[in-house]
Amino acid sequence: MGCSTGQEAVTIALCLENALDGMQVYQVFGSDFHQQSLSDATLGEYDNAQKPFIPAVYHQYLKDVGRDKFALIPTMKSQLQFFSKNLVDAQQSIPLEAGQCQMIVCNNVLIYFRQFEQRDIVRYLARYLADDGVLLLGAGESLGFSDPDLQQIAVPTIYGYCKTVAPDWLKAVANIAR
C-alpha cells in the first residue's frame, strides 16, 4: 500500500524471487492514490544511478532498457500488478480477495492519516490478510490503538501484526531484516 513509483514492490519481488529460487509462485501487488506514480510503477523503468544501491545478487533479474534506464526482466515484471486505491475509501473495490495476502506492507503511509483513519485503514487491510498473513508497518507507525483481530509480533525495526500466531516463514524475513 502506498507503492509510489514501485521501488518497494520491486524490492519485495527481487527478495522473493531470490529466496524462493523459482520454486513457488507469487504475486506482488502495489497500490497508490497518485495516478502518475502508478503510471511510473507500471512502466517499471528506473535510472541507472539507482542500480549501485541494489545488491549484486539481484542484478541477474535486471535488464538495461534505453538510455540510462533499467527494469526487471519480463518474467519478474509479470509478477507485479499495480492498482489505484484511496485508503480512506473502504468502498472502493480492489483486485484482491479477502484472505488472499500472506504479507501486506504499508510503510510510511499511515503517518499521513489521523488516528481514526489509521484504525479504519488497518481494519480494511486486515480483511485481505490470510489467517497466517502478516501486516508490516514502518518503524514510525506504531498503532496508537489495539485491534481485536490483530496481535503484534516481534519483527526487528518495523511493526508487525498478524491475525493468529506468527507464521514460520516470518522467521526468515526477520533474519533478513537483522
Q: Locations of the language-model features?
A:
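Extended basic-aromatic, gly/pro-enriched interface segments that bind polyanionic ligands
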Residues: 1, 24-105, 109-117
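Conserved SAM-binding loop of SAM-dependent methyltransferases across substrates and taxa
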Residues: 5-22
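Short, well-ordered alpha-helices that flank and scaffold nucleotide-derived cofactor binding pockets
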Residues: 14-18, 43, 127
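Short conserved AdoMet
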Residues: 21, 46, 130
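Core SAM-dependent methyltransferase catalytic element
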Residues: 103, 144-178
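Short strand-turn motif at the edge of the Rossmann-like AdoMet-binding core
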Residues: 109, 138-141
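A short glycine-rich, Lys/Arg-flanked "PGG" loop and its adjoining helix->strand segment in the class I
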Residues: 119-131
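Conserved beta-strand signature within the Rossmann-like core of class I S-adenosyl-L-methionine
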Residues: 131-139
